[in-house]
């Protein structure tokens, strides 16, 4: 459990943290999280806004947990669109899921389109989602760490991004942005260049990248008498990172090194180690996997269930407000009228027991026994002067009921407004670039897309 909590709390673990903690949750360098006994956490604002919305929690069904010592949700519907917050691999018996996250703003725009389309259809509440609609709104994976995803075209006129969203399975080739600093540092004989990795692929750590580059350099020295391109010593390959937003792996090149050759070596290492096999496995009622699932299927199932749950929640809230008004009207009738209150108190005192008193009073004042039981608990402390307060509460509840009726008449609009509010607070612009290419190991293409040049100030 401590490991799962750490993953949800890391700024480089998921796109939107569900947990906030001041404890050590590991680092982008590969450091492990602190021991569980030192860990204190609380839910983040994103989790409270999306996963623990009061409207949906009121109608969530629960069942006994594994040990029957508590309860857990049968199904947990949230305001977080499908796969917005997935940047982790999940594995279980006989099946696994490894699906990178998509952008929250893109998902909300897509949901807004689907809700508007559904509102105009004859079968309101049952959503239809096509693959072409998905491809129009969802551009592909979006990692909090940025980077570039190469959309590799195939012979059958499909591509990696289409496979990712439509077929539920693909291989994504993720590469970081690399800065070339000309004349970065002074050496004997002149100034040498430096390559600086400013991003790291999803799931990688800076130390893992450094180890891979260092091992490749050592292999070159061993096999080809000193064919290395990195300066010897600890200054040749250094990690100056300060979190996921400030990644900085500095590769000092030897004087006279062909920069493009060194860059190609680094790219080859990263492409081999950090291509991601993305897939979502659909399971049947018995928990057995039988096929991959597309994003359109995920979105359709999500919206159908969310619509039904929102409708259920609004009706539950409306019914609760009506019951509150019935109680308030009964209080006005019984507690704010002196004669009725005397009758009420006398009946309580003369009845042989509480149950008998509740039944007599329910018949006398023509209200439910539950309302009478509630009024008995406050009868001795309630004042006849509270009538105006009760009336104000009734008026407030009636306004809330009218607002709920408006939402029930157009649940799609209610859902759009809710998602827009979440995107406004928690959404961010896309950080991951999508680059179409037909050949992955094209040195000129990689140089053009990944490298930007600066010159060190002297």
Feature roles, as predicted:
Residues 14, 56-57, 80, 86-88:
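Short coil/turn connectors at secondary-structure junctions
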Residues 16-26, 58-69, 224-239, 438:
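Long, charged, glycine-rich C-terminal linkers/tails
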Residues 30-34, 67-71, 75, 98-102, ...:
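Alpha-helix capping and helix-loop boundary segments enriched in small/acidic/polar residues
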């Amino acid at each position: 459990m401590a490991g799962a909590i750490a993953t949800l709390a890391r700024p480089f673990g998921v796109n939107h943290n569900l947990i906030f903690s001041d404890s050590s949750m590991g680092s982008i360098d590969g450091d492990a999280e602190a021991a569980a006994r030192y860990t204190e956490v609380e839910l983040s604002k994103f989790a409270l806004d999306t996963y623990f919305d009061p409207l949906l929690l009121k109608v969530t069904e629960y069942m006994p947990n594994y040990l029957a010592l508590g309860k857990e949700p049968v199904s947990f519907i949230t305001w977080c669109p499908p796969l917005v917050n997935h940047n982790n691999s999940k594995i279980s018996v006989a099946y696994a899921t490894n699906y990178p996250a998509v952008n929250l703003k893109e998902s909300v725009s897509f949901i807004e389109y689907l809700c508007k389309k559904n509102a105009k259809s004859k079968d309101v509440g049952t959503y239809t989602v096509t693959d072409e609609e998905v491809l129009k709104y969802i551009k592909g994976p979006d990692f909090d760490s940025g980077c570039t995803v190469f959309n590799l075209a195939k012979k059958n006129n499909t591509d990696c991004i289409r496979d990712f969203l439509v077929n539920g399975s693909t291989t994504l080739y993720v590469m970081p942005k690399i800065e070339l600093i000309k004349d970065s540092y002074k050496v004997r004989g002149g100034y040498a260049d430096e390559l600086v990795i400013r991003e790291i692929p999803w799931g990688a750590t800076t130390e893992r990248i450094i180890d891979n580059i260092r091992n490749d350099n050592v292999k070159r020295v061993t096999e080809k008498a000193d064919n290395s391109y990195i300066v010897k010593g600890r200054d040749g390959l250094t990690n100056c990172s300060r979190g996921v937003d400030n990644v900085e792996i500095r590769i000092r090149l030897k004087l006279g090194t062909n920069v493009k050759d060194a860059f190609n070596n680094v790219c080859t290492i990263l492409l081999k180690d950090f291509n991601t096999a993305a897939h979502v496995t659909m399971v049947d009622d018995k928990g057995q996997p039988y096929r991959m699932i597309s994003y359109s299927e995920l979105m359709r199932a999500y919206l159908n269930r969310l619509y039904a749950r929102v409708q259920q929640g609004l009706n539950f809230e409306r019914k609760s407000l009506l019951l509150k008004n019935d109680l308030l009207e009964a209080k006005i009738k019984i507690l704010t009228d002196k004669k009725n209150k005397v009758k009420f108190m006398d009946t309580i005192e003369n009845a042989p027991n509480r149950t008998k008193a509740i039944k007599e009073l329910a018949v006398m004042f023509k209200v439910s026994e539950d309302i009478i039981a509630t009024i008995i608990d406050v009868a001795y402390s309630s004042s006849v002067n509270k009538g105006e307060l009760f009336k104000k509460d009734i008026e407030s509840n009636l306004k809330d009921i009218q607002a709920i009726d408006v939402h029930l008449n157009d649940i799609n609009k209610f859902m759009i407004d809710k998602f827009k509010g979440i995107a406004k607070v928690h959404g961010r612009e896309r950080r991951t670039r999508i680059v179409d290419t037909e050949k992955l190991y094209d040195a000129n293409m990689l140089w053009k897309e990944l490298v930007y040049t600066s010159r060190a100030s002297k």
